[in-house]
């Protein structure tokens, strides 16, 4: 047995294996598998996008709730801050002026 006859035998074996494999897996099976894979990928893509949108919406409302709670506990302006601003400009405000400005600032939130 020489090398060329060995190559021919190996190629015949490969041909028979490929022929048997093609009998087992038909074109319809491949099309069905491709369609299933495609629909799975589309469904997964839509699911990811929907979960991202839902996460953004839920995150927005949670962050707004936390922000409002923080502003209520620690307002950005206090009566002492208003007093200090008036003193920096060289004025001595009355308590009613301070209360009026503070109440307007709190209502604007």
UniProtKB/Swiss-Prot annotation:
It is a single-pass membrane protein. Keywords: Cell membrane, Membrane, Transmembrane, Transmembrane helix. GO terms for cellular component: plasma membrane. It comes from the Bacteria. It is found in: Cell membrane. Signal peptide: none annotated. The chain crosses the membrane at residues 42-62. InterPro entries: UPF0154. The keyword Transcription regulation does not apply. The keyword Transmembrane helix applies. Belongs to the UPF0154 family. This is UPF0154 protein UPA3_0273. It comes from Ureaplasma parvum serovar 3 (strain ATCC 27815 / 27 / NCTC 11736).
